[in-house]
Swiss-Prot record:
This is Methenyltetrahydromethanopterin cyclohydrolase. It is an enzyme of class 3 (hydrolase). It comes from Methanosphaerula palustris (strain ATCC BAA-1556 / DSM 19958 / E1-9c). The gene is mch. The lineage of its organism: Archaea, Methanobacteriati, Methanobacteriota, Stenosarchaea group, Methanomicrobia. It holds the Pfam family MCH. One of its GO terms (biological process) is methanogenesis, from carbon dioxide.
């Protein structure tokens, strides 16, 4: 079976070896754990953002950039594709691990989750778990992890701490904006999984989302990066699953009762409590499904340029 950690390790090794060329910085801790800073104390950029996102996807996704526009305003877009959507998105990219050790906090994603089984139910549903002697984790945090944090990750992954590798970037950073927009496909796969659909029937997935401008405040940055997919994420899924027609009206974000405002405003109204937000909002704006068994195509949802530009501070 494919090892998402083995594939991601290849990308990490290249990033570590040529860190300066990625506007990143490589660190080896006293216990042997290795870290590449992609934005905490470094500039990062598109090249680092691509590597970070592809690491998150366990080496089973491809990332490209292009210039597009939203209502005539030039905007960078990220394009993501994968032929292993269930494993790459749910088994690796999903931010399913809250890493908290002492005063350190980070949202953990990436292939290390498939060793630690975070959360276990996800891996039971998709029928996957990894078996490799190194763990590669992506941490969304304003701070680099110390040795104690890396020891904790190693213990959870059942590997030696010297075999733990982490890439780190804050939400409010160029790489932060890139890698969250790079979750546009994952958002669609995650939504279908939450609806009870068997995502292993999805053969391939491709999607795009605008890369929002970096905000100074982490909470506002989180709002913009979520809005990139909620209001302007466009996804195409190829699958063999005639039953998908029963899920169509629940997939896009515009079916959520919270839809229509920038995410920051919704979050503020909810007193910055995620548990008060309608989770169905976390969906792509527009989805096309090519169902191969019956040879049909479905199209649901629509992009919302107005809210997207308002969120980005361009309207």
């Amino acid at each position: 079976m494919l090892s998402v950690n083995e594939l991601a390790l290849e990308i990490f090794e290249n990033l570590a070896e040529f860190a300066e060329e990625f506007n990143a910085a490589y660190h080896e801790l006293g216990n042997g754990a290795r870290i590449v800073d992609c934005g905490v104390s470094t500039r990062g950029g598109y090249s680092a953002g691509r590597a970070f996102t592809e690491i998150c996807m366990g080496g089973l996704g491809e990332v490209n950039f292009r210039m597009g526009e939203i209502s005539g305003i030039p905007m960078p877009f990220i394009d993501v594709n994968t032929d292993f959507p269930s494993i790459s998105c749910l088994g690796a990219q999903k931010a399913g691990w809250t890493v908290k050790v002492g005063n350190y906090f980070a949202m953990g994603s990436g292939p290390a989750r498939a060793l630690a089984l975070k959360p276990k139910h996800t891996y039971e549903v998709i029928g996957y778990e990894d078996d490799f002697d190194s763990a590669v984790i992506a941490l969304e945090s304003d701070h680099l992890p110390n040795g104690e944090v890396m020891e904790k990750i190693a213990a959870e992954c059942h590997v030696d701490v010297g075999n733990v590798c982490a890439v780190v970037a804050p939400t409010a950073s160029p790489v932060g904006s890139i890698q969250v927009s790079g979750r546009c496909v994952e958002t669609a796969i995650y939504k279908l999984n939450e609806l009870g659909f068997d995502t292993t029937k999805i053969i391939s997935a491709i999607g795009s989302a605008p890369i929002p401008p970096v905000k100074k405040d982490a909470t506002r940055a989180m709002g913009c990066t979520n809005d990139a997919t909620i209001y302007h994420g466009r996804i195409l899924l190829t699958m063999k699953a005639p039953e998908i027609k029963d899920y169509l009206d629940k997939i896009p974000s515009n079916k959520s009762k919270g839809y229509g405002k920038p995410f920051y405003d919704i979050f503020k109204e909810a007193e910055f409590d995620f548990y008060k937000i309608d989770t169905s909002l976390f969906s792509p704006a527009e989805v096309i499904i090519n169902e191969l068994t019956e040879g049909v195509v479905y199209h649901v949802g629509a992009v919302n340029p107005e809210v997207t530009l308002k969120s980005f501070g361009l309207l």
